[in-house]
Amino acid sequence: MTRLKPGHTLAACFIGYITQAIVVNFAPLLFVTFHSQYDISLTVIGLTITVNFGVQLLVDLLASKFVDKIGYRPCAVAAHLFSGIGLLLLAFLPEILPVPAVGLFIASAVYATGGGLIEVLISPIVEACPFDNKKSVMSLLHSFYSWGQVGVVALSTLFFVLAGVENWAILACVWAAIPFLNAVFFLFVPIYPLVKDGESAKVTSLLKSGAFWLFVVLMICAGSAEQSVSQWASAFAEEGLGVSKTVGDLLGPCLFAAMMGIARVAFSRTGEGFSLRTALLIATGGCIAGYALCAFSPVAWLGLAGCALVGLSVGIMWPGTISLASAGMPRGGTALFALLALAGDVGCMAGPSAVGALSDAFSGDLRTGIAFGLFFPVLMGAVLLFSGLKRKKAPVLLNEKDGSK
């Protein structure tokens, strides 16, 4: 048997992000179906999103405590098993249990556990691989979440057209095969240490570092800027253009994800010629312009173009911030990646919720809510411009005793 190499580890991590895209994006395509098939209110169905992100937040928080003790390989295998089992439970539990909604909640919690672990594990596994062009590889890695999202929406839509949406449980089982197969792959690929034993920073050390909190703000802004448009892109397309739900999904979140993927692949090929700070500043500028088009353009197609521009711009925000933090705090270890994932997920929850609440406050005007979303890229740009991160300096090395730099 040929000895597996870092490239195989990277391939397994690519599939890991595709798995996360499946567990995050598949169920929302079926919300209307769940409503009609099981007679569950849309409010209750919408709570599955809260369960999904809530469990992921909890996993992000706890992972910094147990991943280093258990090891990356068993945790990565477990993450994919949770994801696959959760998708199978989604297919069968609502039919088996007397209260279908309970089945949806249990399935969501199980696959969200897998998704949360994947989010914490995959980036540090790739960061530890012996690649020279770390930030380019990180950007390419995160593009696979975007391509996974495009694939889930497009292929699921095609399946529903050809086989009928009533057969969605079959598709859930098909999607479950991907994490199960990748769990086997992770049993064999090489896993490299992120930092030497005993040199990884403790959570308390990170919390005492001013630089760490700047990275937290950047991650919250990155998650909020991305999801504030992504989660509402379908509704924006449907309302603005008067198209069907299927077309709205393809023109909204599918186009948004494709633009994110394009940005991440492009940066993976050209990013070594830019400083991360410069690239992130360009991204925030494009994001601000895209939000302005979405919120203030009187022409619906220009608003949709604004959604696409936001997708293109936010593409490098999440992986770029992770790379910036990893380079600045090389002893951060698993705790750094787990807490950054937690901050990003907080942004993913807070941004869309704020947009929805403000839209409701202004008689359902989605543009008003999206206009509020401008706050996040503006804040991110301000942190990049005016914080100490703008200066070229040595990495932030943490003193384990007091957290000082």
Where does each model-flagged region fall?
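Intracellular juxtamembrane helix-capping segments at the cytosolic ends
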Residues: 117-130, 316-329
